[in-house]
Amino acid sequence: EFDSVHGRAVGTVTHGDDWMDVGSGKIHMSRERDPANIPHAAHGVDIVLECSGKFNSREASAAHLAAGAKKVLVSAPCKNADQTIVFGVNDNLLTADTDVVSNASCTTNCLAPVAKVLADSVGIEAGYMTTIHAYTGDQPTLDSSHKDLRRARAAAMSMIPTSTGATKAVGEVLPQLQGKMSG
C-alpha cells in the first residue's frame, strides 16, 4: 500500500493469489516465466505491456500473441519489432496490423524529438550525443560481484560510462538521420 515514488495508495488495496484490486475491480496477475503460458485469451487481453526486460526480440515477445494477446508494446529496444515508435516523432506510422511495437529506449525517447525538430527546421549533417543515465536494476546498491567490474560498484557512488544504442535507434525512427548520429 506504499510506494517510494507515489506514496500511500489512495483507497483500499486487496489481493488474492492471482489478483489484486486497487479500488476499480480485480486485476489478474500471473507469475509465469513463459509468456506463451499466460492466459491472455481467457482474460480478453488486448495489449500486453512487455516491461520485463527479458523479451526484447520480436520472436520472444510474440509469445504473448500466441497466448491470445492482440498486440504487444515492448518498453525497450526490440530486435525485429514490427515498428519502433517514439510518440510525437513517428507514431503516425502505426497501423492496425502492427502487432509488436517497440517504444525504443528512454535515451531514444529524449533524443529523437529534439533531433526531429532540428532536422525539420535547419537540417542535420552529423550529430554527436552523450547520455547521463540514472542507475538501473542491473547495478547493485552496494559493492557486489558483476560480470562487468565497473558495474560491480555501488550505483549511487559511481558514474559508470556505458554504451547506448540510441544513435542507431534514432535512425530507425527518423530514417533521414540514419548513419548521421554517433555517441
Across the structure, where does each feature detected by a protein language model lie?
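Charged docking surfaces used in two-component/phosphorelay signaling
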Residues: 138-183
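N-terminal Rossmann-like NAD(P) cofactor-binding subdomain of oxidoreductases
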Residues: 1-141, 145-152
